[in-house]
């Protein structure tokens, strides 16, 4: 991380952090704080307006679940995604929607990333 001591409100990047055991990176300045769950691809977990301390993203009641400690026990399509869904803002690549096959490749509910 590079700090600019002459501009204390400049952007800061903190890596090596985690949310409930899932690795994350935090980007913030005086106006916005963004927490990205790098341990889950690039899920944006928090998008906070700093002056009002308002997180603009939905959160599930169960929050972040660490895939290293949770046993998935459902075979229903889409259940794996929902087991680990914490709210926030997900990247949905290469598929946004129901599980499907494309050119012989099986794509899970809301992608594979």
Regions found by a protein language model. Give the residues of each.
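Surface-exposed acidic/polar loop and edge beta-strand patches at domain peripheries
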Residues: 1-113
């Amino acid at each position: 991380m590079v700090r600019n001591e002459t501009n204390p409100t400049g952007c800061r990047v903190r890596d090596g952090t985690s949310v409930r055991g899932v690795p994350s990176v935090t980007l913030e300045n005086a106006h916005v704080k963004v927490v990205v769950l790098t341990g889950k691809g690039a899920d944006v977990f928090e998008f906070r307006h700093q002056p009002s301390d308002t997180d603009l993203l939905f959160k599930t009641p169960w929050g972040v679940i660490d895939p290293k400690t949770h046993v998935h026990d459902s075979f229903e399509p889409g259940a794996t995604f929902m087991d680990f869904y914490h709210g926030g803002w997900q990247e949905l690549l290469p598929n946004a929607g129901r599980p499907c096959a494309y050119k012989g490749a099986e794509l899970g509910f809301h992608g594979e990333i």
